[in-house]
């Protein structure tokens, strides 16, 4: 008797399980949420309606001083400034295929489980990687590490690097200052990420920058306290250190370069993030499709997602991202 590869009930079961398992980013899920107070805002506006364009409102900080006592409020209200960014979604799919009925007749369920697990991992890692690429692309707000010298803000952040310009605790503090008090009026203030009434920012650094940071005496001093380790919020999970309310996280997929300092300095493009630094726009849940091929002998499984990842911008300026260029110890050498 022939093996029945699938039924509509089985396909729906696996579709729901895949949609649940693959519905979030992997590493960057700790920074993502539906609120405009998340570093990566998840927008699902197209789940219930047709279309390919999602409009995201970028929320600016209120700057007014308010009124005191019985002074008149009418006429002294502050305009709520919002800017709109359009994000166009597209479809991404990937699939796997079984070897055949003879190979799978005793392990059909295992094949589906393996397909779900591997496609979930592939989508999670793909989204993480793509988001880092998007956030790193063509930065308009930058800081170049400068070992004890004058900070290089925007100008020569990468080209001015020398091998000694590794990550420092002082630079992390400077990044926060640049977020809250931009050095030029063309840069909007970067709103913090809210958690339990506190304001935080995130700095995502590469593995080599993390290595350099951990070997510094300043890092070891901060680690004597490590108060954040008891925090249950995902934002704090695996944070390497917290500097002046900047949560430092390590991610091995951070962009690297070998042409710093003009041509020879190896380093990384680390990412400082505030609220609404990026957008994860989704046009629906992950899809799961099964069909037989080779005249019913093999099962093909395809996972898909309609989405787009984007870095937010205000008047062509990065809205809540600062690229932090550092020289690093080349661990691949």
Task: State each model region's role.
Residues 2-20, 105-333:
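Core alpha/beta structural scaffold of self-assembling particle/tube/pore-forming proteins
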Residues 1-89, 317, 321, 326-333:
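N-terminal "assembly arms/tails" that initiate or stabilize quaternary assembly
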Residues 60, 100, 305-309:
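Beta-strand elements of well-folded, non-transmembrane domains
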Residues 79-107, 272-275, 283:
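Short acidic, glycine/tyrosine-flanked loop/strand segments centered on an H-E-D-like triad
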Residues 37-43, 84-86, 93, 99, ...:
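Generic secondary-structure boundary/loop-capping signal
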Residues 51, 89-91, 198, 296:
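Short, solvent-exposed loop/turn segments at the edges of secondary structure
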Residues 61-64, 101, 120, 124:
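Generic short alpha-helical segment signal, independent of protein family or function
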């Amino acid at each position: 008797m022939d093996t029945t590869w699938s039924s509509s009930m089985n396909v729906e079961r696996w579709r729901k399980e895949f949609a649940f398992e693959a519905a979030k980013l992997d590493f960057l899920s700790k920074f993502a949420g539906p609120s405009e107070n998340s570093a990566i805002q998840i927008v699902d506006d197209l789940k219930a309606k047709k279309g390919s364009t999602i409009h995201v409102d970028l929320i600016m900080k209120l700057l007014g001083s308010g009124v005191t006592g019985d002074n008149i409020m009418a006429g002294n209200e502050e305009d709520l400034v919002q800017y709109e960014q359009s994000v166009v979604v597209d479809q991404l799919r990937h699939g796997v295929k079984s070897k055949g009925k003879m190979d799978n007749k005793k392990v059909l369920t295992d094949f589906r489980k393996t397909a779900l697990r591997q496609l979930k991992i592939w989508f999670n890692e793909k989204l993480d990687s793509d988001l880092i690429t998007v956030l790193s692309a063509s930065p308009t707000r930058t800081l170049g590490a400068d070992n004890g010298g004058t900070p290089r803000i925007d100008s020569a952040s990468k080209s001015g690097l020398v091998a000694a310009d590794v990550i420092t605790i002082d630079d992390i503090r400077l990044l926060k200052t640049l977020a809250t008090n931009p050095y030029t009026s063309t840069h909007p203030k970067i709103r913090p990420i809210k958690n339990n009434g506190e304001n935080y920012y995130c700095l995502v650094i590469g593995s080599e920058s993390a290595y350099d940071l951990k070997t510094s005496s300043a890092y070891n001093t901060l680690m004597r306290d490590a108060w954040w380790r008891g925090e249950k919020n995902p934002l704090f999970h695996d944070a390497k250190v917290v500097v002046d309310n900047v949560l430092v996280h390590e991610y091995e997929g951070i962009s690297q370069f070998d042409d710093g300092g003009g041509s020879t300095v190896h380093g990384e493009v680390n990412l400082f993030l505030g609220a609404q630094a990026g957008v994860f726009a989704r046009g629906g849940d992950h899809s799961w499709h099964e069909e037989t091929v080779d005249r019913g002998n093999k099962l093909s499984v395809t996972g898909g997602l309609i989405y787009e990842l984007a870095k937010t911008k205000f008047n062509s300026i990065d809205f809540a991202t600062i690229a932090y260029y550092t020289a690093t110890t080349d661990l691949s050498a």
